[in-house]
Regions:
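Tubulin/FtsZ superfamily GTPase core signature
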Residues: 1-259
């Protein structure tokens, strides 16, 4: 069981997607939510300083949270000012943070300052081993990867893509592949990105571009019929993977699962 925490209304919309699955316990925090067993009303203020002065005590609310916690935070949102204070209250947990980065070119004023501050501090948390991992999604890159995305369904499709990506990574961690082995990332490599893979040519569409990736893990899903009948498929895939950039500082691993 993994506990999912959404900090703020936007992040909680993503967290709500996990209700469709059985292996998660969901905690929603935002000004749109009423106090209940799994939701907490966060007060909204006009300036960031007020958030820092009014960090809620969530120890009772989160007392039954699992040891493995995945926290969703939306960059530039005023509610992200609560994030550091909330993370401090669950610091004994194994915390994975998923950060949704907005289009910073169009940010101005206070939202831009908030985004810069929270994004920078969370990276330092990851580098200091206070977080198990810090995974970044870019709204810009997600939009590029999605077809039929309109203004009306923009955020729902973005949220669905984030949910699907995280859920399947969680699934792969606990399900044995048909063949191959995903290497465990080194402790030092805590800042991550996720992307979509076209297995026809092994081309990637990253949902955030890391500057210097040190490890790349390929999770390959193939239907049962192809796995059973297509001879030479494994060699074909492995040969393409061997053409990927790799050296002593950049490792590549893979696994193949049945869909």
């Amino acid at each position: 069981m993994i506990s999912i925490i959404g900090i703020g209304n936007s992040a909680s919309r993503i967290a709500e997607k996990f209700k469709l699955q059985n292996n998660y316990e969901i905690y929603l925090l935002g000004s749109d939510y009423e106090n209940s067993k799994n939701s907490f009303n966060l007060k909204a203020f006009e300036n960031p300083e007020e958030y820092e002065k009014n960090i809620p005590n969530l120890k009772s609310f989160l007392k039954n949270a699992n040891q493995d916690v995945q926290v969703f935070i939306t960059g530039s949102s005023y509610s992200s000012n609560y994030a550091l204070g909330i993370l401090e209250q669950i610091k004994e947990k194994r915390i994975e943070v998923f950060y949704i980065k907005p289009d910073i070119d169009l940010l101005t004023g206070i939202p831009k300052l908030i985004e810069n501050a929270v994004y920078g501090v969370l990276q330092e948390y990851a580098r200091s081993s206070l977080l198990k991992s810090f995974t970044i999604f870019s709204n810009i890159e997600l939009e590029k990867s999605l077809s039929n995305i309109s203004i009306k369904n923009y955020f729902d499709m973005i949220n669905q893509a984030i949910f699907s990506s995280v859920h399947y990574i969680n699934f792969f961690k606990y399900a044995e592949p048909e063949i191959g082995q995903i290497s465990k990332p080194l402790e030092i490599n805590r800042i991550c990105s996720i992307g979509a893979l076209d297995i026809k040519n092994m081309s990637e569409k990253w949902f955030f571009e890391l500057d210097s990736p040190r490890e790349t893990c390929y999770y390959i899903c193939i239907n049962k019929d192809r796995l059973e009948k297509e001879s030479g498929l494994h060699k074909k895939l492995v040969d393409m993977l061997k053409e990927k950039p790799r050296n002593a500082f950049r490792k590549v691993s893979y696994g193949i699962w049945e869909t």
